């Protein structure tokens, strides 16, 4: 089939079951585009003449000539280019003759301003899916799309009057680009606080604060980004530190109740503030404990910093009243002239920025999220100094707010006058002086720990004393312990044997028997090694032991006895499984095998 002999008119089909809608001719200003797909039948079927049937549209008085004639098409098809494109679409039945002629119809949704992205789906799923996957035919008059994938069709650029015109069938990439560009144009003309999900706007500067939705964006076709660019922007926002311009709900911070601590080990090229201990190049981060000038025998390039740059309380709404950053100085030299820390009631508690990433080639940055209790974190450096600072994080709650679970004893009691004062620094927090004989003058100690209440310490001490075994029981003589153990049941003795090795040795050495024990105290049973029963025996069952080779009967002074396991009622008890019950040696008169035993003895 020659492609040059195909007709360029628009395809049309009626609605199912022969229902027509009103025919809407295209205005003369619209550009008539070539057909989306050629007819496999060679265009012989549309040339039926004036005969109107159910599948033929009624003739119209006005015909629109083609504004863009195809150069490769035949000249005889110029009179058929003025066909009217109906706003109807037809579900192709399998086996219909129109399936060979029409595959798709550009459907206009009643003069709306957006292009229809509806899939042409049929009610009969046998052959209609084949037509939906047809590729677009070759059109030499249409320019190929640019590498960016953004193509401005004439219907979207002519103005609001022609913005809702029919759009020819496009490929998947072209349709995605068209939808993205139309959404971007609509968002530029009508700024709204909510941005649709498929459109992602990337701010022009990555280092500065992120822009809002209604703020100035990049002009031109670069407004809507591709999928890869959006994914890269999302990953960059997730990996990058939080900026000051973000709101609190947009800030990528930890969850409620988490403490995020950033540690940075960098080289010594950054200058240090002499008195406050805060770096001058990092934007004044509070809570950074910088050691002092390096000693003669220490490395001058390494210093360890500890930044507590975000602390989110369990209640984010009452953040100023729930979170306090209290800094306690431990050194005696700077105790008098150090200024008091600002309370969150006076200034809004904006979290300090994270440490900068320009740490040099030898530095690295680690983010540690701590959700549990931080008792004490000790970091040893190589710089000898006395300026060691404690950073204490105190969580306080209002009296009407219930305490968070798991932190009942970690919350300080809030008095009626105001928040509690920071506890005084203890002696272990002081740095070792230069006059130490151990030579630890060049080791600086930076501690970050959380103070706990005195009630918690008392309760923890009482619980530990209750849980630990009594130490004075080890001082008792053995005969007293044996007498005490003889009054205990089976489960208590088993628990003592599993708890303390000393008690286990006494119980096994002296043969302590439980009060509910079924071991035979007869000395004749002392030679029986079988102490465990694992097999399920019936009452009166006589069989060999599973672990010890011994006869199933025993000749005793009072007659031949047979070994059997525990009774069925006692077999499920833990004592039987632990081997603390006795093995029953029953006489022939007690078991069903007594007659057989008597016959064996008579032989």
Swiss-Prot record:
Pfam families: F-box-like (PF12937). Residues 152-163 have a biased composition (Low complexity). Residues 347-356, 417-426 have a biased composition (Pro residues). CDD domains: F-box_FBXO46. The modification Phosphoserine is found at residues 21, 67, 338. PANTHER family: F-BOX ONLY PROTEIN 34/46 FAMILY MEMBER, F-BOX ONLY PROTEIN 46. This is F-box only protein 46. The gene is FBXO46.
């Amino acid at each position: 089939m020659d492609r040059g002999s195909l007709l360029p008119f628009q395809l049309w089909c009626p609605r199912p079951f022969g229902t027509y809608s009103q025919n809407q001719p295209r205005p003369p200003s619209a550009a008539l585009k070539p057909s989306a797909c050629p007819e496999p039948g060679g265009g012989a079927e549309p040339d039926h003449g004036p005969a109107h049937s159910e599948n033929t549209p009624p003739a119209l008085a006005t015909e629109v000539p083609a504004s863009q004639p195809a150069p490769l098409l035949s000249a005889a098809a110029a009179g058929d280019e003025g066909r009217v494109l109906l706003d109807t679409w037809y579900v192709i039945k399998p086996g219909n003759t129109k399936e060979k002629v029409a595959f798709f119809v550009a459907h206009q949704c009643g003069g709306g301003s957006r292009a229809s992205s509806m899939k042409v789906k049929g009610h009969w799923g046998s052959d209609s899916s084949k037509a939906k996957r047809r590729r677009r035919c070759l059109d030499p008059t249409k320019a190929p799309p640019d590498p960016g994938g953004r193509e401005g069709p004439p219907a979207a650029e002519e103005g609001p009057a022609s913005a809702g015109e029919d759009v020819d069938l496009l490929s998947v990439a072209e349709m995605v680009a068209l939808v993205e560009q139309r959404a971007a144009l609509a968002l530029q003309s009508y700024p709204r606080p909510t941005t649709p999900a498929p459109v992602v706007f990337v701010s022009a500067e990555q280092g500065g604060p992120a822009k809002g939705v209604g703020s100035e964006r990049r002009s031109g076709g670069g407004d809507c980004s591709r999928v890869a660019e959006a994914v890269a922007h999302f990953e960059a926002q997730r990996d990058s530190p939080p900026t000051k311009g973000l709101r609190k709900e947009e800030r990528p911070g930890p969850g409620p109740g988490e403490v995020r601590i950033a540690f940075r080990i960098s080289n010594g090229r950054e200058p240090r503030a002499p008195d406050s201990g805060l770096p001058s190049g990092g934007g004044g981060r509070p809570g950074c404990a910088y050691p002092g000038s390096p000693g003669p025998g220490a490395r001058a390039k390494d210093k360890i910093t500890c930044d507590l740059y975000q602390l989110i309380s369990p209640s984010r709404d009452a953040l100023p009243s729930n979170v306090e950053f209290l800094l306690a100085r431990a050194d005696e030299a700077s105790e008098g002239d150090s200024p008091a820390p600002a309370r969150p009631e006076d200034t809004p508690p904006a979290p300090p920025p994270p440490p900068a990433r320009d740490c040099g080639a030898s530095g690295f940055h680690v983010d540690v999220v701590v959700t549990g209790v931080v008792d004490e974190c000790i970091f040893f450096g190589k710089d000898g100094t006395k300026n060691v600072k404690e950073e204490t994080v105190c969580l306080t709650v209002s009296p009407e707010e219930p305490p968070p679970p798991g932190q009942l004893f970690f919350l300080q009691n809030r008095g009626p006058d105001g928040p509690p004062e920071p506890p005084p620094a203890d002696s272990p927090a002081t740095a070792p002086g230069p006059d130490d004989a151990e030579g630890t003058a060049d080791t600086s100690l930076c501690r970050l720990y959380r103070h706990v209440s005195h009630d918690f310490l008392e309760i923890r001490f009482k619980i530990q004393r209750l849980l630990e075994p009594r130490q004075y029981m080890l001082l008792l003589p053995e005969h007293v312990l044996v007498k005490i153990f003889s009054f205990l049941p089976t489960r208590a003795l088993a628990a003592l044997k599993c708890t303390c090795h000393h008690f286990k040795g006494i119980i096994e050495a002296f043969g302590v028997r439980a009060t509910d024990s079924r071991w035979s105290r007869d000395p004749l049973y002392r030679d029986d090694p079988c102490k465990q029963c694992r097999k399920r025996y019936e009452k009166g069952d006589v069989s060999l032991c599973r672990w010890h080779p011994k006869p199933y009967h025993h000749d005793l002074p009072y007659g031949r006895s047979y070994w059997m396991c525990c009774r069925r009622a006692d077999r499920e008890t833990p004592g039987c499984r632990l081997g603390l019950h006795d093995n029953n040696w029953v006489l022939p008169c007690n078991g069903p095998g007594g007659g057989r035993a008597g016959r064996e003895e008579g032989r």
